[in-house]
Regions:
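Nucleic-acid endo/exonuclease domains
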Residues: 1-121
Length: 121
């Protein structure tokens, strides 16, 4: 089960659902709110540091005026963050509320396990 952020932050319903699905799928241990960049304060919602794999949960995509991830500048900032992560060797799986399903999470957990095996070769 992923360790939760210790700073008393509110854990979203989307994050709680992800944790349940990830646990059921037998996914490897994750760190919540992992700061991955050496100079920026960017964080991944969940990360497997040893495999450099991360989960991003994009809530609010279907709100009438869009959430942060669906607005112009939010999308621009997300792109900047994801490019920087790729430059550092990270792989990222993104989920919205609609695509956070047991099947999708199970497939992602399998990909994480394969990435962990590749890193140990």
């Amino acid at each position: 089960m992923p360790s939760e952020k210790k700073r008393g932050a509110i854990v979203s319903a989307l994050a709680k659902k992800f944790v349940v699905l990830w646990t059921v799928a037998g996914g490897p241990e994750l760190v919540a709110e992992h700061t991955f960049h050496p100079t920026r304060k960017w964080r991944f919602d969940f990360a497997c540091k040893s495999a450099r794999c991360a989960i991003e949960l994009d809530g609010g995509a279907f709100l009438p005026f869009g959430g942060r991830h669906g607005r112009g500048m939010g999308m621009v900032k997300d792109c900047e963050k994801y490019r920087a992560a790729a430059d550092l060797g990270w792989r990222i799986w993104r989920f919205t509320t609609k695509c956070l399903t047991a099947e999708a999470v199970a497939m992602t957990a399998k990909s994480f396990r394969l990435s962990m095996k590749e890193k140990t070769k």
